[in-house]
Amino acid sequence: MIMKSQQNRIEVSDQTLVVLRAPQRIWSKLYQYQRVCVQWLWELDQQRVGGILGDEMGLGKTVQVIAFLASLSFSGRQLAQGSRGSKLGPTLIVCPTTVMHQWVREFHHWWPILRVSILHDSGSYSGTSASSLIRSTCANNGVLITRSDH
């Protein structure tokens, strides 16, 4: 249950206080409906359930997902060791081949701190085995982008 929503801070109340902090440089550029989406994604994460994000093309689904992942990354960096709370773990994004490189560009634009790799013949793992790339991405809590089409 969301208790309080400030400009770039979402506090969730359950048995313990868990806080998601969105980076100001991202949060300040989001439209209100995109902020609501980030809050919704946070609620799903806290409930340990999935969801489907869908709307018209061009309304910023990619940016909303990146804002959420950046917030998990940002919050995780600020968590004191041993405290409870969410942080970003390894992330898999499955999308059409035609937009994989667009995802990478958007990550580099919005939150370049994250390590982002493409697992595809045209991607960033040339010269490295796919299993090596997957292990490296998991070890570094990075983002792996792969295709959904065959």
Where are these regions (language model features)?
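ASCE P-loop NTPase motor core, strongest for the SF2 helicase catalytic module
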Residues: 2-150
